[in-house]
From Swiss-Prot:
Signal among keywords: yes
Annotated source species: Saccharomyces cerevisiae (strain ATCC 204508 / S288c) (Baker's yeast)
Compartments where found: Endoplasmic reticulum membrane
Main location: endoplasmic reticulum
MF-aspect GO terms: hydrolase activity, acting on ester bonds
Its job: Involved in the lipid remodeling steps of GPI-anchor maturation. Lipid remodeling steps consist in the generation of 2 saturated fatty chains at the sn-2 position of GPI-anchors proteins. Required for phospholipase A2 activity that removes an acyl-chain at the sn-2 position of GPI-anchors during the remodeling of GPI. Required for efficient transport of GPI-anchor proteins.
Protein name in UniProt: Protein PER1
Amino acid sequence: MRLAVVVTLLVHCFLVTCSPGDNLDEFIDCTYACEYNRRCPNSQINYIDPETNMFHDIEFFDTPPLYSKLLFWDCISDCDYQCQHIITRWRIDEEEEIYQFHGKWPFLRVLGTQEFFSTIFSIGNFIPHYKGFVKFSRIIREEGDRRRKNSRSILIWNYLYVTVAGMLAWTASSVFHCRDLIITEKLDYFFAGLTVLTGFHAIFARMTSMFLYPKIAQAFTASVAAIFALHILRLYVDWSYTYNMRFNIFFGVLQYILLIMLSCQNYHALQKQKLMGEFKKTAYSSFKRQIFKLCVIPILLVIVTTMAMSLELFDFFSYEWQIDAHALWHLCTIWPSWVLYDFFLEDYAYWGNRQLY
């Protein structure tokens, strides 16, 4: 779910500004020694005191050529990486607390990726959005072939935009967890903002039946697109983690509220059908299935996603298994995306069969 992605970024921003490992004297001495011994280009370290720097005689390794060329690991960043693990192993041997560096736990590179499990689970999150894209694209083609372009098409197009934003966001997340650079971080943040806006746009248009009024729907879509453009411009002119998080959380919370309201709206519509006798006794099980699919599922999505956020709030890390709470959180967001698109399809089919609003 999209608010979950935003909360993840919020926690990351907080950790970046207060990672205790960055300020360890031994970590600083280690990076100085590595840059000096390896003669790193663009390094400002021209001398280290062998009497005070305990790392002066350590043999540091050269950056693997594949990492250097494909993943942009230069000498300085590789020294930072090596020293993180030198210090971490030393602290483990001394039975001291493992510290974060630059807002991240000290992960070992696996196949060149900085955070292997977060990368894998981000790719896993891409799949339900891609599957949703395929399903909604098929519906659009079928309705186009049947020349049934009507107000329902607007609703499906809105859901298609959500899938595209989701694919972009999780692609950016995969790249960011594979290699943390300024550009990959910014793209991760930008597309997270796009997901909350497209989700808000689609659910709000559905709940208000805006798709029945094409001109109003077009104006609303243009307004949301303008908001996103201004959001990116604001960050380009003056990057602010605080502003970015407030923006994303605002629209993310609105999404959750709208999902709950849509659930209530569907419930009242189903109850109205029941009172009108549209659900006979023999078909009561059908009524219960509809209640579950159209009313219970969206509320479950909100509850499950909110509960899973505790993985971010109560962070933990296993150096032995190279996995942390953030990676497990990405694992927990795969199922809600599958279910969300199934809900969109069920709701779309239900509205198409019964003109209730």
